[in-house]
Structures are given as structure tokens and as C-alpha cells.
């Protein structure tokens, strides 16, 4: 991005944050958040969720952070909670999809946003 492009994006984000969302956008946002949270919880019982949780606990340890891992009783450092949550959310591919972009934004964005939101007082 050029500086001009960065400034345009920054200005748009600053203005968007202050504006109310249209109700249909707010409803779609709620549905995507709930869908991703459900995928994070159900994914904890699947191989990818179990392995991610085991991996982060092998060096981070439980109870050493300020971010929860949905679907478990664990509290982890935010980066580890986001990683393990993202792995679980995508474990059985029930997470959301952006058809035009052919990607799953929720499994990366929602766990990270939740971890940061819990970490920041």
C-alpha cells in the first residue's frame, strides 16, 4: 500500500468505528460470531483442537494468561488462546466462508479478537 492508500483505509476505519452498523449488517455479524464460537467449542474435541491445545500448553501452561479458550476451562496467554481457538474453529470446517474470496475469515479473526478483548482490561 502507498501512504495515500494507507491514509484512505485509516480514515475509513476511523469513520466506520464511530458510525452505527445497519441492522442487517449487525445481525449478520452476530450470526458469524456465534457460528465461529460454536465451531471453536466443537473443535476442541477434534484432533486439530486437541493437538493445538496440547502444543500451546507444552510451553505456555494453563492459567498463565488472561484469555480463555472457548470450550475448555483453560486460561492462556492471548497469542496461544487465539492460535488454539483458531485451530479448533477450523477443525471440521464448519466455520464461516467468504465464497468470493474462498477463505474462512471467522476462524482467524474471531479467536484473535476474543483473546485481545479479554486480555485488555
Indicate residue ranges for each PLM-predicted region.
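N-terminal core-entry segment
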Residues: 1-121
Amino acid at each position: 500500500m502507498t501512504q495515500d492508500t494507507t491514509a484512505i483505509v485509516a480514515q475509513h476505519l476511523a469513520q466506520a468505528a464511530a458510525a452505527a452498523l445497519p441492522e442487517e449488517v449487525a445481525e449478520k455479524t452476530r450470526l458469524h460470531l456465534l457460528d465461529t464460537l460454536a465451531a471453536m467449542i466443537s473443535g476442541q474435541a477434534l484432533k486439530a483442537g486437541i493437538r493445538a491445545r496440547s502444543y500451546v500448553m507444552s510451553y505456555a501452561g494453563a492459567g498463565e494468561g488472561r484469555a480463555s479458550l472457548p470450550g475448555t476451562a483453560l486460561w492462556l496467554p492471548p497469542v496461544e488462546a487465539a492460535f488454539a481457538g483458531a485451530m479448533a474453529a477450523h477443525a471440521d470446517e464448519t466455520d464461516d466462508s467468504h465464497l468470493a474470496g474462498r477463505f474462512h475469515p471467522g476462524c482467524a479473526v474471531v479467536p484473535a479478537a476474543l483473546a485481545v478483548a479479554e486480555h485488555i482490561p
